[in-house]
Amino acid sequence: MALWLTLVIALTCFGGLASPGPVPPHSTALKELIEELVNITQNQKTPLCNGSMVWSVNLTTSMQYCAALESLINISDCSAIQKTQRMLSALCSHKPPSEQVPGKHIRDTKIEVAQFVKDLLKHLRMIFRHG
């Protein structure tokens, strides 16, 4: 009987350790951004944003959301990416104020918005998978 009780208590304790915890809000926002980018890339019948060009940015920095937003913010009259811009803005504002100020980016390459969105999607999926 004592052994059975010990086993039940041990399983209860280990069960609590193995149960998933709450999903952080950042992960939810990241997942929603990924879903939005998937929708944008899948529904392309015409060139995204009329083939507009944006600066290529280094998405591996700690300011990746702010850098992506900074690159896309200059695109006007493109309703397809407005929601993406708002989502990036929300993710960028999660940074401490000292990190929000964009550093000097090396701006030597412009790419089409469609390619930028595909690259951003690939990068964000990697972040989501690997935490």
Curated annotation (Swiss-Prot):
UniProt keyword annotation of Nucleus present = no
Name where it's found. Answer: Secreted
Q: Does the keyword Cytoplasm apply?
A: no
Keywords, ordered alphabetically: Cytokine, Disulfide bond, Glycoprotein, Secreted, Signal
Q: Which GO terms describe its biological process?
A: immune response; inflammatory response; interleukin-13-mediated signaling pathway; macrophage activation; negative regulation of complement-dependent cytotoxicity; negative regulation of endothelial cell apoptotic process; negative regulation of inflammatory response; positive regulation of cold-induced thermogenesis
- Which molecular-function annotations from GO does this UniProt entry contain? cytokine activity; interleukin-13 receptor binding
GO CC terms in record: cytoplasm; external side of plasma membrane; extracellular space
InterPro entries for the chain: 4_helix_cytokine-like_core, IL-13, IL-4/IL-13, IL-4/IL-13_CS
List cystine links: C49-C78, C66-C92
Oligomeric and partner information? Interacts with IL13RA2.
Can you tell me which family this protein belongs to?
Answer: Belongs to the IL-4/IL-13 family.
Q: What is this protein called?
A: Interleukin-13
Q: Which gene encodes it?
A: IL13
